[in-house]
Structures are given as structure tokens and as C-alpha cells.
Amino acid sequence: MAVQKYTVALFLVALVVGPAASYAADLSYGAPATPAAPAAGYTPAAPAGAAPKATTDEQKMIEKINVGFKAAVAAAGGVPAANKYKTFVATFGAASNKAFAEALSTEPKGAAVDSSKAALTSKLDAAYKLAYKSAEGATPEAKYDDYVATLSEALRIIAGTLEVHGVKPAAEEVKATPAGELQVIDKVDAAFKVAATAANAAPANDKFTVFEAAFNDAIKASTGGAYQSYKFIPALEAAVKQSYAATVATAPAVKYTVFETALKKAITAMSQAQKAAKPAAAATGTATAAVGAATGAATAAAGGYKV
């Protein structure tokens, strides 16, 4: 199952580079008959203060998706355990459909804006499909947890590239300061966002090289030069190797999309593993020890790719 979930992430390139599709088309398979069990740790968080004001069409769309996500979590929290998954999917599906419709119906402002909007819709659609796949085959007790956790992390990464308040799991939102064991993954997550932003501004054929260089530079800067690239984290290095294998003889733009998807999946896996793991005996342990605990937990749980 772990290998199947990781394979799904690698092949999301077909969804990301293809035409954007409404989430309504996915609801037919997004609400399976098996009822969900209670989800732990997803009670809605109280407002954490003013978020950055959305200015671009893309930012406004992400903000609406963010609001819809939190409304769906709140709705799921108020129904019996057996209805949580179905309620979340229905509520979030309606909100995201509305956001898509409003974004696509705005007055055209040029080919560049239309292209940017279409790219965002495609990435959002891919995030929804990834979340559904992550919950596919899960036990009733885990289905809601898996779906919401995967979707929230995917949306957070997408939102990060737009420099706007992103969706975060409620358990993370209620914390004023990240726990010590999350700080290393926070740096990796931040490096990913920097690299994705740089790649988005580069020509299609240069996105892959720009992303990889920016990602390594950001990691080096955030660790004070202690690490030169992503290779100090085994799970990331393994993800990169697999993404390279999947991009042989493909166009540069496609290669970048597969590479980005693979890293996104690996970072999400490590983040979830660290959140689930118990705090280390020494909260001031080294970065290497923290990363080792995270990757070890992920591997033990599901081959290193459980989300």
C-alpha cells in the first residue's frame, strides 16, 4: 500500500500538466460507501490573528479554499463518527467548486493571467486526488485522518508558493511555536517553498534546474552551511532518486513537475511522521537526530511514504 501511494504521487504529473478539472467530477469516487470513524486532532482552531490580505486572483482563490477547508473540518466535527468523512468531502467539495467557478468566471486579464490561474487550478485538483488516494483502502478509523492530513499539507505547500496564509492541520495551528522535533522539517518545507517560487518564475525548460539549485541553496542557508543539499535526509534523497527514474527521456517541464511532486510527497511524509512521533528524550537534540527519528518513524509506519 505504501508503494502504491507513492506511485500515485509520481504519476500526478498527468493531472498537473493536463487541463484542470472540477472537483465535482471527483465526488463520485470521493465519497465511498464505507463510513469514516472518528478523527483525532482535527478540531477547528480558533482564529490566529489577521492573515496576509489576498491581492492576486490566485491568492484570493487559495483563501477561499482555505476557508472552505476549515468549514469542512468544523462540519465534520459536529456529526457522528460514521459521517465525518462523507460530511467533510461534501462540504469541502461545495466550497472548492464555488471557488473554482468564481476564479474561472472572472474577467480575462491576458494570456499570462489565464495560464497562471489554470496552473493553480490543476495543482489544486491534483492535491484533491492525492488526498483521496491516500485514504483509499484505509480502515474506517484512519480514512478521515489520512484524507484531511494529506490534503492540508498539500494545500499548505501550494499556498506557500503564493506567499499567502496557507491551510495547516488544526493541531499545528493552535501551537504558538513549533515543537523542537518539527524545526528541521520546517526548514525543509521553507526551502521547498523558496525553490517552488523561483521555479514558477522561470521558463518551462529551465524550471527543473532552477528548482533544484534554489532548493539546495535554501537548505544550505537555513542550516548555516552545515548541509549542502537535500542529501542529508535519506527520505528526500530516496524520493529524488525515484523521481529521476520516472523522468528519463521526458520534456524538461514534465521532469520538473514529477520532481516537485515527489519531493512534496516526501516532505509531507516526514512532517506527518514527526507530528505522530513522541518528543525525543532531549528536546535540544541535534538536527541529524531529529531527522533520523522522523525518517525512521516514516519507514516503520509505511515504507517511508505514509501520509
From Swiss-Prot:
Keywords: Allergen, Signal
Tissue spec. comment: Pollen.
Endpoints of the signal sequence: 1-22
Coiled-coil ranges (or none): none
Domain of life the protein comes from: Eukaryota
Additional remarks: Its C-terminus might be membrane-associated.
Protein name, UniProt field: Pollen allergen KBG 60
